[in-house]
Design a protein with these regions (language model features):
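Short, solvent-exposed loop/beta-turn-alpha elements that line the ligand-binding surface or hinge
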Residues: 110-125, 212-240, 301-310, 370, ...
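Extracytoplasmic/periplasmic substrate-recognition and gating elements
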Residues: 50, 54, 81, 165, ...
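C-terminal capping/gating helix-and-loop segments adjacent to ligand/active sites or protein-protein/ligand interfaces
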Residues: 355-362, 375-429
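Glycine-centered hinge/linker elements that transmit conformational signals in sensory
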Residues: 181-183, 223-258
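Extracytoplasmic/periplasmic substrate-binding proteins
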Residues: 35, 95, 204-205, 209-214, ...
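Extracytoplasmic/periplasmic solute-binding protein
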Residues: 134-148, 153, 178-230, 275
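Hinge/lid segment of periplasmic solute-binding proteins
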Residues: 94-152, 205, 296-298
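Conserved N-terminal structural module of periplasmic/extracytoplasmic solute-binding proteins
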Residues: 15, 25-105, 114-121, 169, ...
Length: 435
């Protein structure tokens, strides 16, 4: 789950109406909403829509770009009102895709997935994150969305700051990370870039501490928790993760003034060398890649965990909404989605510094940034180990708000780790009972 405050609308004329002897051949309109607000993402989308133009000269793509928060607030209501997009990205969790699928606001994509062979470019484990059953079961039933980008939440680090502080690289495990935090603090540098005024950096840090305690071989209970099959957020690992987060705030490991800093500003401060570490996602590659000292690694796990999970998965899935009410409109929407997840599009995303969910062609002619090389290597290893974890806010429609309301209390010492875990669990159990 990523956030960037932005709202941008553009109408890209994918072909123009042809006027022949005074008669206009009307172009098809394809309203599209997406969340690609970062500068390099905008550039990639402009290139991709331009290439769609070459294939579909009779289509007008009306693109609206929103932050994920804005999309979540407006999309369902817009589609219900009949004035939303025909194609849109939708966050895969219960709050958004689950609710819209259950309400009949999304079109199943299984026939198109078979027609276009989407399963050849993305693993079943990734595609299953767009599935919702008629009974509201996450990860099962029809597929409603497929993604352009893979996402890993890992640990960005400034190599020069760590060397200056006497930290030995690579950091082997969680104990080594704890040692590095103290050495950086002793050197007079903020160990962790953090901002809680807007965005989800503390959520991703909490989830990373928690999920790296889970080995891929033992992930079934966590999968059940996220997919709404039952479980608890009050386990020892959940409480310990909250305790670490609170301790780091109390010990001054977080960027000074973090409560008044947004996630985006924290990323910029990290890029400028104001902190040693940033726990964030691969969607930040384009933002931080201009600093050659910055590298990316999986979040360090306890030494005894053989194949630790990493928070992540895929970016919001491309969907066809019920606004596309005819077969012709749905076919057009599917052709646009195919364009967004094709191997050729994977090359475009890689060229702009992002991690594509669809595998790059073996003969792809693209020069990868150092960060992206690191990201792809980690992505391939995590996929091979079945160790791509989850975004914890997918577990209920209100979990993102619950985490966002309670983490500031935890960091400020106004809530114990046990109370924090209990708040998450109360949200989750209420959701299970409502099903």
């Amino acid at each position: 789950m990523k956030h960037r405050q932005a709202f941008r609308t553009s109408c890209i004329a994918v072909g123009a109406a042809l006027v022949v002897q005074g008669t206009a051949a009307a172009a098809q309109d394809l309203p599209v909403w997406d969340t690609y607000t970062y500068e390099n993402q905008v550039a990639a989308m402009q290139e991709l829509i331009a290439s769609f133009k070459a294939e579909h000269p009779d289509v007008n793509v009306n693109e609206t770009v929103r932050s994920l928060d804005d999309l979540s607030l407006t999309l369902r209501l817009a589609v219900q009102a009949g004035n939303g997009p025909k194609v849109s990205q939708v966050n895969q969790g219960a709050k958004d895709m689950g609710t819209m699928a259950k309400s009949g606001l999304l079109v199943p994509l299984d026939d198109y997935a078979e027609e276009y062979g989407w399963g050849a470019g993305q693993s079943a484990g990734l595609i299953d994150r767009g599935r919702w059953s008629e009974s509201g079961q996450f990860g099962e039933g029809p597929n409603y969305g497929i993604s352009s980008l893979g996402e890993i939440v890992g640990l960005f680090y400034n190599e020069q700051i760590l060397k200056d502080a006497g930290v030995t690289l690579p950091i082997a495990d969680f104990e080594g990370f704890l040692d590095a935090l103290q050495k950086v603090k002793d050197a007079g540098v903020a160990p962790i870039a953090m901002g809680t005024a807007e965005g989800n950096l503390p959520l991703h840090l909490y989830a990373s501490i928690f999920e790296t305690n889970i080995s891929a071989e033992d992930r079934a209970p966590f999968d059940d928790l996220i997919y709404g099959r039952g479980g608890s957020w009050t386990t020892e690992a959940n409480v310990k993760a909250a305790k670490y987060l609170q301790d780091w705030a109390e010990e001054g490991y977080l960027l000074d003034g973090y409560s008044g800093i947004s996630a985006n500003d924290a990323v910029q401060l990290f890029t400028a060398g104001q902190a040693a570490f940033l726990t964030g996602g691969t969607w930040y590659f384009g933002d931080v890649q201009n600093n050659p000292d910055i590298h990316f690694m999986p979040f360090p796990a306890p030494a005894e965990v053989e194949h630790p999970l990493s928070v992540g998965g895929v970016d919001p899935g491309w969907t066809i909404t019920s606004i596309a009410s005819t077969k012709e409109e749905q076919d057009l929407g599917a052709s646009f989605i195919q364009h967004m997840v094709s191997p050729e599009t994977a090359v475009v995303w890689a060229k702009h510094g992002y991690l594509p969910a669809t595998a790059l062609p073996e003969d792809a002619d693209v020069e990868l940034s150092g960060l992206l090389k690191e990201g792809i290597s980690i992505w391939d290893e995590l996929n091979a180990d079945n160790a791509i974890g989850h975004y914890i806010d997918w577990s209920s429609p209100t979990m993102l708000d619950t985490v966002g309301d309670n983490i500031p209390l935890l960091l400020a010492g106004r809530q114990t780790p046990e109370e924090f875990a209990a708040a998450l669990d109360a949200d989750y159990q209420a959701y299970l009972q409502s099903q």
